[in-house]
């Protein structure tokens, strides 16, 4: 009854009453956005949101721009393509690709935060030096590597919710790894990746326990901290 009264007051004032609802699961959040809210009483502004998606956008999308500096692009966080990828276009409109650089995002922990970062990266990691006219093996793709000890089970659940991801994206290579970031072989791979001059490597630690996340982030192979 009290909510109805508030709605009535809002209708009298001809203002919408904002109603913000946090959806913890990204799949539920995606589904609710597709629903049509009943319009019998159009005095409510329904705004669903997801904490993890909001933070993913603050890190890497346009939401990452620092609003304190309106004169230029000033992100709060380094973009995934921290060396801008460019192409050259001649007067005839033909383009040539000089940059062989590519983004490689490694997400450790396929938690809610890890999944949100993954989905946001899929939205934004499309770069100018991908050329679909080249043979498949010569195309420069973004790589996203997802690492979790329980990946086999989690991947099945995730791909059930998002069944068409890989079939709709040609310029991103997705690697699901059922592995432990502390595994010596995995650490050797991280070291190798960090020394690749064309690979723009970003590692996001997203395990559910904050203390473990901090420990993992501070104890990666030394070469990762030494590089750009």
Per-segment meaning from a language model:
Residues 1-228:
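Cytosolic regulatory regions of ion transport systems
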